[in-house]
Structures are given as structure tokens and as C-alpha cells.
Amino acid sequence: MDPTCSSECIYNLIPSDLKEPPQPPRYISIFKATVKDDMQKAKTAMKTMGPAKVEVPSPKDFLKKHSKEKTLPPKKNFDRNVPKKPAVPLKTDHPVMGIQSGKNFINTNAADIIMGVAKKPKPIYVDKRTGDKHDLEPSGLVPKYINKKDYGVTPEYICKRNEEIKKAQEDYDRYIQENLKKAAMKRLSDEEREAVLQGLKKNWEEVHKEFQSLSVFIDSIPKKIRKQRLEEEMKQLEHDIGIIEKHKIIYIANNA
């Protein structure tokens, strides 16, 4: 029997819609993940345009001449008195081998860690959101000076300076008082008063005698000047004699 006869059917005469063949699976490279990772590594955020907000440089920090040049390290002076390092051991010297120690380093280290004092972290402060850290102690944020015992106390050198100034002022005042006492008024004794009075009278007599010896006619300028001078001297001497005779007690400046 013909095998094609079994496939014959009346329904095969009905025209059927053509079906498109299924598409093959989409190609996916096996290196896709590797390529993505390489691209992410090569990229950097804000690399071409820079960060959004940047601190503006201060005009005081301008670029100075030779500031970009490399500076040599400070020169060290060679000291010949410094002892030399120990010599390198010879090739023939062999170190002692086989020495062993019975110390248990594991237990020793564990005991040192348990009994030791924990290391305190260094105090710092952060001033930006990006995490810039600085030492806290030299920043001035810690009230270090107001907690000192000698805070608000006058320094010792100022107290010493004030004492020296006070002592110098006292010495100066004492010197002035001594000079005032030396220059104080002293009283004339009766003998001294009488001697002064007699001396003034004697001077008056001499001036009066000279005045009496003048010519009768004063017909020249020198004669007039001489007469006026003698009259003034006699008048001053008479005034002094009158004061001394009037006052029995007289004080004079002590210039000794």
C-alpha cells in the first residue's frame, strides 16, 4: 500500500495561513560584563568639568617667583668625631647556630596586650563634609589656657618690674627730701645779723663818700650815669639796712 495515501485528507484542500518560522535566539556576547567593568573603571566622575563647588583661592596666596622650584634638603655638616659604624663581619665568621629559647612568645604577647593600657585615639576635628581632619589641640577649640592654674595671675616678671619701679620711686623721693632739708631756711644768729648790718653801713658810707666827691656841675652824660648809679646803690643799701634793723629775727636759705 502506498504510504502517501494515508496522508490524504479532504481538509488538506482548505487553504491555510502561512506561518513565519520562529526567529533564532538573539546574540549575546560573552564579553559583555567584562566590557562594562572596563568602561566603569575608565570613567571618573567630574573629571572634565571639575567639582560643582570649589573653594576660591585667596589673593594673598598668589604664585610667587621660584615657588615651584625644587629645593635641596638642608646640608648636613660632617662631624669627624662621630664614631664609625661596626665593621661588616668577615666571610669566614660563622654565627652561632642552634640557640633556642624556651620563652612562649604567644602567651607573653597576649599577657602584654591584656595588661597594657589601651591606646587613646588622637583627638581630631572635621571641618568639611568631605572629611578633612585636623588636630584638635592646636586648633584653639579646646579651652586649654583658661584651665591653667596661673590663668589670670599677674606674671612674676611683671611683679618684679613693679617692685623695682616702686623702689626707684622711693629712692628718688628720699633724695628729693634730703635736698629739700639741705636747702631749708636757717635763722641768722645775733652776731651774724650785727656783722651783716655793720657791713651794709660801711658800704653805704663808702658809696656816700664817693657820691659827695662828685663835681657840683653835672654837665656830661657819663657824670649823670655815675650819679644815678650811686643814688641807686645808696637807696638799695638804705632799704636793706632798714629791713635788718626793723626785724630782729631773720631767716636765710641754707645753700651749704
From Swiss-Prot:
GO biological process: establishment of left/right asymmetry; flagellated sperm motility
InterPro entries: Enkurin_dom, Enkurin_domain-protein
Domain IQ: 176-187
One Gene Ontology cellular component annotation held by this UniProt entry: sperm principal piece
MF-aspect GO terms: calmodulin binding; SH3 domain binding
Keyword Cell membrane belongs to the record: no
Motif segment (SH3-binding): 83-89
Record's subcellular location: Cytoplasm, Cytoskeleton, Cilium axoneme; Cytoplasm, Cytoskeleton, Flagellum axoneme
Domain Enkurin: residue ranges: 160-252
Residue numbers spanned by region Interaction with TRPC proteins: 160-255
Pfam families, sorted: Enkurin
Keyword terms: Calmodulin-binding, Cell projection, Cilium, Cytoplasm, Cytoskeleton, Flagellum, SH3-binding
Subunit structure: Microtubule inner protein component of sperm flagellar doublet microtubules. Binds calmodulin via its IQ domain. Interacts with TRPC1, TRPC2, TRPC5, but not TRPC3. Interacts with CFAP45.
Entry remark concerning the domains of this protein: The IQ motif is involved in calmodulin binding.
Protein's recorded name: Enkurin
